[in-house]
Amino acid sequence: MEAYKREFIEFLQGAGVLKFGDFTAKSGRKIPYFVNAGMIKTGDQITKMGEFYAKAYFDKLGKKQAVLYGPAYKGISLSISAAVALSKNGLNVPFFFNRKEVKDHGEGGTFVGYVPQAGEEIVIIEDVITAGTAIRESMEILKHLDGTKVIATFIMVDRKEKGQTEKGAMQEIEEQFGFPVYSVVDVYDIIEYLEEDPANEENVTRIKNYLAVNGAK
């Protein structure tokens, strides 16, 4: 396993972002592990998270100029931390996020931060994709930005699950919207990491059994 993947998984566990047990995903699926960016609670943690996103960005997009979009609520801090980390490494990109409730006073509007203009490209910063529900919601919001184009989505963990069909949720998103989805790690990296310690046998078995039913074909 690559060193940065191991470091990232250890970071997720240490911060309480990656947990094992019985959970319900946004898609309604009962899942044996949960990735919750809402557990990031300190300056050090969000700084570190931003660095992992920035590494993924540079690895996949290089120095490409784009606007970062963080879907409310968890994507807000993720997109800001990614923008800060990119800036520290020589790439200054704008960011914005949506309001859950549209504001009808003050400056008003659906978005907070930089609002992309026609011809500009957008990168979505999300935490995780299970069935692709959240990304589809984001695309419904972003379609009102005439002349802009989403070119990629970055997530923490690819769960490698089927979406609305037997295909992987990420593959479905890529085919439906025409942009790639990149992850720092995927569930098989997590399994490989867990298998190094026999104490994790139960969690490994539960995840493998879950993937046998819900994994992408």
Located regions from the model:
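PRPP-associated nucleotide enzymes
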Residues: 1-125, 130-217
